[in-house]
Every structure is written in structure tokens, then in C-alpha cells.
Amino acid sequence: MAESIIIRVQSPDGVKRITATKRETAATFLKKVAKEFGFQNNGFSVYINRNKTGEITASSSKSLHLLKIKHGDLLFLFPSSLAGPSSEMETSTSVGLKAFGAPHVVEDEIDQYLSKQDGKIYRSRDPQLCRHGPLGKCVHCVPLEPFDEDYLNHLEPPVKHMSFHAYIRKLTGGADKGKFVALENISCKIKSGCEGHLPWPNGICTKCQPSAITLNRQKYRHVDNIMFENHTVADRFLDFWRKTGNQHFGYLYGRYTEHKDIPLGIRAEVAAIYEPPQIGTQNSLELLEDPKAEVVDEIASKLGLRKVGWIFTDLVSEDTRKGTVRYSRNKDTYFLSSEECITAGDFQNKHPNICRLSPDGHFGSKFVTAVATGGPDNQVHFEGYQVSNQCMALVRDECLLPCKDAPELGYAKESSSEQYVPDVFYKDIDKFGNEITQLARPLPVEYLIIDITTTFPKDPVYTFSISQNPFPIENRDVLGETQDFHSLATYLSQNTSSVFLDTISDFHLLLFLVTNEVMPLQDSISLLLEAVRTRNEELAQTWKKSEQWATIEQLCSTVGVQLPGLHEFGAVGGSARAATSAMWACQHCTFMNQPGTGHCEMCSLPRT
């Protein structure tokens, strides 16, 4: 009998020992490997070196002896999905997480950037504690990992939640390199396809039954900071409450960037706030269907922006003479109500965080919640939040309800004949100081909330131009602020900057040019949006010479507002006679009338 040898084969699932002989062919050996690891014949590749060089092919003429494979050698197995090199996978994350993940999804640019960063916290030599030379390192100056809790707790202010990418580094650290860890999304639903019994409510088994959920305070957050580019963005949003006293809602449009104050942190920079159709009162908000939502997202994308969160006001005036507001959200009441947590969870489920380390291709969300409310000094403060991944799962699977009389409490639904709901628990401290487990009926929503710092920069940033007479914001008809060609003509007449790009760089103006019903420019505005995105005045001037802008100026001239550069209300190069032969907008109802008429066809009021 030929001398037996043992070959070790390392795979993403661990190391196994294969018994073989020196004269055994490579093809026979690979069949043993496939059987041992449970692969099909072509479902894997085996290499002599870890860097995927020296592949062992299924040859019937080459023996292990000819391949110089000896007793005790270590070979490396890679499944087919991991066999090819990928630039996205060249990070410090573990092979284990990659094996469980979805390698074909495209992550956000900020995630791709941070995954390639070192992330370690470098410290200089301590002159009092370090006893070595300038080139040496010791425990007092060696670089720290980005998830070091002691370092985060001693920051000013202390950081309660590590960044998401620091959390990934923590999972992939240690001896096993995260081999047995997967970023799996929580499911509160019964698994479908179980044929061993009747469907719920007539039957259930341990295979299809979702596990009970014990709520824990999440140790990480997907976004570490919310920053408004300048005060004007926030002040214009607050103007609605200042003028009406009613609460207001808006979507935050901006971009995700690196937050350098926290290791591997992410910041949501807000460049504009879009206000959808809504009905607001002093203590409630109702969102209406928005037919322009997809167009707004498309325009924002062409401007290099995306929807990064939502904002709402909760302001009650305390002293109108001093301009103070009531301080109502604090540790003695609540920071987010249960209804607001459910709304935030719904928004986060609609905007998932693309993640290649999750089998589903997504994990958590970077969608943030901002609240304009009263602070301890009775001035308007902006607070930022997210809800945990556990809350997202409870909201997605319709397991969480708000409490009517206690906004600080939620309620986990009970199972019914239509829906099975797993038990939800949370841990608390009783009056004797003992840790006890409580059923989440009711549930303090503080277990679901993650707070995020909200800031303004010392040096303001301006993605869009700031004007003393800005263009009206959409959906503010209750204030008498309407977006029409009369307001456009007024805006253009008051903003006489010689730089056309500065005049046209207004988020709400660009939305009006695309979404107005008289002259929508959705198919011809791409060049202008590119000019605004890149701050290119030449591109803006090129678009200004187009027929579309000439038509816009012609429509503005019919509403009776003198535009700079136009002669006697005529279009470019036109005259007053040309204006009278064009369509004109009624100053009372904005209806576009046919040329030659003296009264509006809609409201019957005179033209002048």
C-alpha cells in the first residue's frame, strides 16, 4: 500500500484534512476535496499559495508528487463566487463576512471609500509615560482601533455609538477574523414554504417560527453627524412656522461625506430642503400624495444630491415678545414619540443602506431624522436621530403600534389569526437594582432611538446661491407664496447679477422650471443642471442662449414685470408689439390666455 499523506485544505468555512497518497493524481485528489467540502466538481478552485497562484487543475497525468505537494502542506480553497479577484473586496474585512455577503451589489461611494481606509487612531509619543526613542512604540502610543470604547468615551462630547464601519472592523477583528459573523437583517415574519404542517393559524413549527426579540440599545450608528451647509437653508424652512404657527415637514437633500471627528464616521450634509404637499396644524402633520416626488429625486440626482433624511418642526411659542419657544422634548418627557419612531422606521426601510456584507444586499439605513424643537435655553434647536435596525424590522413587519395617551411608549402587537407576532422583550432595572426582562407591552421607545449630533459649519458652504429676494418655496400657497411665472419674473427682475449661474442656482427655482405645467423643461434642462453641479458659468451661458430660455423670458414678459435685458417687456431681441401678440398670464389667477384678448378667460378679470 502506498504511503499515506495528509493534506490540509483551508476554505472560508475552516480547515479540513484530506487523506491522499503521493502517487494520487490531481483529479482524484480534487474529487476528494469536493466530497469533503460538499462542492460540485466545478464549484471551487484550489491553489498552492494564499494569493491565488499555483492553481491545481484536474489533471489525470500529474500526481501530487510531481506537483511537489508533501505531507502536511496547506492548500487554499476558494468557492467560484470568490475565486476571481475584485477591487471592491480588497479591504481588511474578513473572508467569513465576504462568504456570507452579497458581492455583486454596488455600495455608496462613501462606503467604498471608508472600507479602504486604515481607520486606526494614531497617537504621538507621550513625553511622560513613553520610555523609548522617537521611532519606538509602546502601549501608551501604539495606534488604537477605531472601535476603542475608552477613546470614544473620552472624546468631547463623549461618543455613545461607534461608526458603522468601526463596528465592521470590530466584527472582523480577533483570531477568527469574523468568519462566523454575518450582517443578517431581522425578520419578524413566519418563513414561507414550510410544508410539514398547515399554514398559520392552524400550524407552526420551530423551522418557520421567527425567534423572540430582545431589544438592546444599538452600539453603532450608520450616520454620525448631520450638518446643514448654512443657516439660510434651515431659516427658510422655519419661516413657515414663524408666519403661520403651524408645524411643517420637509425632505433633506444632500450628500454623504466623511465625518473626521469620529473614526470612520459618516456625515449627512444637507444642501436643500424640499417641502412636499402637506396639511399642518399647531399640533399635527398630514402628508399628502406628491405627484412630483420622482421628478424631484431625478433632478436632485443630476445635481449630485440625494434624499438623506426628513425634518419636521415641533415648536410652540412661549413668549412672542422675547421670541422664545417651549422646551418640551427632554429626558422627563420624550425625544421622539412612538408615532415618530414608526414614521422614521418606515422611511429608513424605504431607503436601505446598500451593503455587500449582508446576504440580502442591504443592512440598516443612512436615512436620518431631524427635529426643529425648543432647547433648554428656549431657543430653536435642531436634534438628529435614527431608529435602530430592530425598530426597522418591527415597523417593516407591522409589529409595532403607538400608544395613544403616552407618546413615549410603543406597543408590540399580539398574535392574531391573520398575523403571528414574535414575543418582544426589553431589559430594565427594578426598584431593588436587579436586571429584569419585561414584555414590550408597553415599550419605552428610548430602546429604539439613536441620537445623532446636528451642527452648522463655522465656514458656511453654498451648493446653491443665496439671494436677498429668493424664489418662493414649493407648496406654500397658504402663505400666498406661489410658484408661477409672475413670481419668476419678479425674482429675475430683483436679481440682476451679471453672473447668470448665480441667478439660476436656486434649488426651488430649478424644480419649478422642470415641474411647471405651462413650460416644463424636464427634457432640456440637463445642461443647466450640469452647469449648476460643476459651477460652470460657460455651460450656463450656453443653455441661456437656447430656445427654451427665450420662451421662458417671453412668458415672464407677459405678466407685466420689466426684466433686465428685455426691451419694453419684449423677448430677447423683441419689442412691445411682439409681447402683445404672445400668450399672457392673468395677474389674478395666473391662467395663460390667448394673445389679443383683454380679459382673462378663466376669471373674467381685465388684463391690466
Curated annotation (Swiss-Prot):
* Molecular function (Gene Ontology), one example: zinc ion binding
| Functional pathway | Protein degradation; proteasomal ubiquitin-dependent pathway
Instruction: Give every MPN domain span.
Output: 226-363
UniProt superkingdom: Eukaryota
Pfam families from the UniProt entry: NPL4 (PF05021), UN_NPL4 (PF11543), zf-NPL4 (PF05020)
- Where in the cell does this protein reside? Cytoplasm, Cytosol; Endoplasmic reticulum; Nucleus
Q: Name one GO biological process term.
A: proteasome-mediated ubiquitin-dependent protein catabolic process
One Gene Ontology term, aspect cellular component: nucleus
Q: Which UniProt keywords apply?
A: Acetylation, Chaperone, Cytoplasm, Endoplasmic reticulum, Metal-binding, Nucleus, Zinc, Zinc-finger
Return the similarity comment. Belongs to the NPL4 family.
Q: How does it assemble?
A: Heterodimer with UFD1. The heterodimer binds ubiquitinated proteins. The heterodimer binds to VCP and inhibits Golgi membrane fusion. Interacts with ZFAND2B; probably through VCP.
Q: Any notes on this protein's domains?
A: Binds ubiquitinated proteins via its RanBP2-type zinc finger.
Protein name (database record): Nuclear protein localization protein 4 homolog
Q: What organism is listed for this UniProt entry?
A: Rattus norvegicus (Rat)
